[in-house]
Amino acid sequence: IKQLDGAIGYLNYGYVVNSNDFQQVSLQNKAGNYVTANAETSAAGLSQIVLDDQLRGADANHAGANAYPIVSLTWVLAYPESKTGVKETLRYMLSEKAQAMSDGLGYVPLPEDLRQKALAAVETLQ
């Protein structure tokens, strides 16, 4: 994208928010509003993803007035009988402290309901 003058592309939130090399455009969401990606608009999009009991979900382009239309979750695969430290690492990643650092690292803090669902899944690990 950077090498071709006038190129349009899609980048992970972290590449845009932590770089002066790329310009961001506003995208029209289903509600008809033009929004740019930031922690607030991305979280608004994430908060509308409906997850089943296996934490699977789709269609992140919901009609929230302030929702950024292109959002996705980052998934972690952990086996029920995981190695020592996996459960503790995932607990930390989902902690309020770690979530508070997310935006500065180029990630969007999880909405509280998604964070709680993920924590419940972590607790099933042995």
Q: Which positions does each model-derived feature cover?
A:
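Exported/periplasmic ABC-transporter solute-binding proteins
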Residues: 1-126
